């Protein structure tokens, strides 16, 4: 008897820089290494190449749309993909894709899990409704105890469905001995680093709560010469870039 090869579909807004994107790629590799079929559905991005290296199949679809008037059309296209791929499990990794994809789990009788990567804030009624879709999964993955606490504070009735799965880190990616000197020199020249000055680096996507402004404020109190590199701060958010420039 031939053992069935299960197909897992991960759906996220895009494949650009971020923890969600990195997690999807790493989960995809783990799935394929364990004889699962991995498909990923997103609107694309510069991490597509990394995803394909895992052996996953990528479908490009506008699942990042926050326009409810477009969801039905996108949902119809997504339904075709899920049926053609005989998907056994859907993993919804963000709110907009969840609003599009969750109803299909019910229609096609496919189990759905959701994952929560950000804090839920009690802002207003409509925001709570928008956030609530991530609590509809058969299982809710929280990436930390802090996130679990945040979910329970906003949606106390879903506590039994939450599973905390902490983010892993591939230490080989951050091992300096694995980086060739020529690459280090090339990147230093590209950034414009000066020799013999200490380098302070912050690597993060552009977001107010990531701590950029705290770092800039702290560095303003340092009297010694240094170089500060903000990796990722210019990733498309021009309004945020302008705020940083004004602060500096």
Language-model features: locations:
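A short helix/loop element that forms part of the nucleotide-sugar donor recognition site in Leloir-type
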Residues: 175-193, 243-246
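Short His-centered aromatic/hydrophobic patch
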Residues: 92-98, 116
């Amino acid at each position: 008897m031939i053992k069935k090869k299960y197909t897992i579909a991960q759906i996220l807004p895009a494949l650009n820089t971020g923890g969600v994107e990195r997690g999807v790629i790493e989960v995809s590799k783990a799935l394929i290494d364990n004889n699962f079929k991995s498909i990923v559905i997103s609107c694309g991005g510069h991490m597509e190449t990394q995803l394909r290296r895992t052996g996953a199949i990528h479908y490009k679809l506008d699942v990042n749309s926050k326009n409810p008037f477009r969801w039905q059309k996108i949902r119809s296209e997504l339904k075709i993909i899920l049926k053609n791929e005989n998907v056994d499990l859907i993993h919804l990794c963000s709110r907009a894709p969840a609003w599009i994809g969750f109803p299909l789990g019910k229609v096609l009788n496919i189990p759905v899990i959701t994952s929560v990567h950000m804090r839920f804030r009690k802002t207003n009624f409509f925001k709570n409704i928008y956030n609530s879709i991530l609590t509809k999964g058969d299982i809710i993955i929280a990436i930390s105890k802090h996130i679990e606490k945040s979910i329970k504070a906003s949606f106390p009735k879903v506590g039994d469905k939450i599973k905390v799965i902490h983010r892993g880190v591939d230490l080989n990616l951050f091992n300096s001995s694995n980086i060739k000197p020529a690459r280090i020199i090339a990147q230093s020249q590209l950034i414009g680093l000066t020799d013999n000055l200490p380098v302070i680096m912050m690597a993060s996507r552009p977001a107010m709560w990531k701590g950029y402004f705290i770092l800039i404020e702290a560095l303003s109190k340092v009297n010694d010469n240094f170089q500060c590199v903000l990796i990722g701060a210019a990733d498309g958010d021009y309004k945020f870039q302008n705020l940083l420039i004004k602060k500096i």
